[in-house]
A protein has these predicted regions:
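One-carbon transfer enzymes
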Residues: 1-229
């Protein structure tokens, strides 16, 4: 399968590496523009962009997705079968999602529809959830509302923190994405793929809003367990 990979942070890298080392072909990568991350205001590329450059994969760093005709033209030239999206950082519009032959697919780090949105790992920890997981869903214009192809549940251990859980879910995302791509490669027609509507899963719909600055401060009156997390 010819794939355009969309991702930005370190979290995306494991999936990118696994797909790039598989029988499938990454024909292009889309990531966030370089950002100022040091005192000298030096522009630093994303981890995904660094990987693209070091592996000689065409990379695009658009400032915007909507109404970006130049980007649409370049993406269509790649003649891709799939878009694979994991922690890209922006919402893709319908015109973009419909470019690849067999759709756009996202690896989301929660058991949807619980924790739709930008910070599912953090919200699961803060809410005291006992389990979480990764779902591979077919993307649509809604916020993480697409039908699910496959998912896997994992336990959140008592001693789990953001770093350890992020690593686990990053590895799980890579594993499930390859499995999903192989399924789609065999079917070659999304109408034949067995997808599950999120609303049939009997789970509460919750939204994982971005973590605010105030939430980063420790409350010394809190429990030792919560402070550790």
């Amino acid at each position: 399968m010819k794939i355009v990979f969309w991702g930005t942070p370190e979290y995306s890298l494991r999936s990118l590496e696994v797909i790039n080392n598989s029988k499938h072909e990454i024909v292009g990568i889309v990531t966030q523009p370089d950002k100022k991350r040091s005192r000298g205001n030096k522009l630093i590329p994303s981890p995904v962009k660094k990987y693209a450059i070091s592996n000689n994969i065409p990379v695009f760093c658009p400032d915007k997705i909507k109404k970006n005709e130049n980007l649409l033209v370049e993406l269509k030239k790649l003649n891709s079968d799939l878009f694979i999206v994991i922690a890209y950082g922006k919402i893709l519009c319908g015109e973009t999602l419909n470019i690849p032959k067999y759709g756009s697919w996202n690896a989301h780090a929660s058991l949807l529809p619980r924790w739709r949105g930008a910070a599912p790992i953090q919200r699961a920890i803060l809410a005291g959830d006992k389990s979480t997981g990764v779902g591979i869903m077919k993307m649509e214009e809604g916020l993480d509302t697409g039908d699910i192809l496959i998912e896997e549940k994992i336990k959140i251990e008592n001693e789990e923190n953001l770093e350890t859980l992020t690593i686990k879910l990053s590895d799980l995302s890579a594993k499930l994405l390859i499995k999903a791509i192989d399924i789609l490669n065999i079917k070659k027609n999304n109408d034949e793929v067995n997808l599950q509507n999120q609303l049939t899963l009997n789970r509460e719909i919750k939204y994982a809003n971005m973590i605010t600055k105030s939430e980063y401060f420790l409350n010394l009156d809190d429990t030792a367990e919560n402070i550790y997390k």
